[in-house]
Amino acid sequence: MNVVNMVINCRVLESDDVPSYRDIRLESLKLHPEAYGSNYDTERKKSELFFENQIKNQSSENLMIGAFHHSMLVGLCGLITIENDQFSIVQMYVKSAYKGQGIGQALLSKAKSLLLQYQRSGLVLTVYEHNKQALNSYIQAGFQETSRRENEIVMQFVHRP
């Protein structure tokens, strides 16, 4: 979908968003199994996915940000609290038809804006080194490489007030 000036709204998902979250999460696992630590067949059989529970209970430790085009959920960015009062970014995904529209950057921008609200010092993520599009997107968003392990690059964004 190539729409000029597409209006995207990013926000933390709420209970009413759980069915849409499940659909897009399973889609991400089915279409891009190489990008995630979970797999489609295992996850689709679960009665409740990890983040479904977190969303329903409005956890302040683990958040799922959604990107919406009108009322349709088109992107995800999960945040899990880790040591040193940081969020780890997980389950980053944008629907294929919406790639290249700045939605990933909008999700990362929303994640950065939540650092102050949830009193976190930074964001950490891992990206497969072969995923050049994601890697470039993270660099553009201000993330810096901190280390490498196997075929993954560990990156960090530190909030500076």
What are the functions of these language-model segments?
Residues 121-135, 139-161:
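C-terminal "cap" of GNAT-fold acetyltransferases
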Residues 94, 100-113, 136-140:
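Conserved acetyl-CoA-binding loop-helix of GNAT-fold acetyltransferases
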Residues 101, 117-121:
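Short coil/turn segments at alpha/beta junctions that flank glycine-rich nucleotide-binding fingerprints
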Residues 12, 94, 129:
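Conserved residues at beta->alpha junctions
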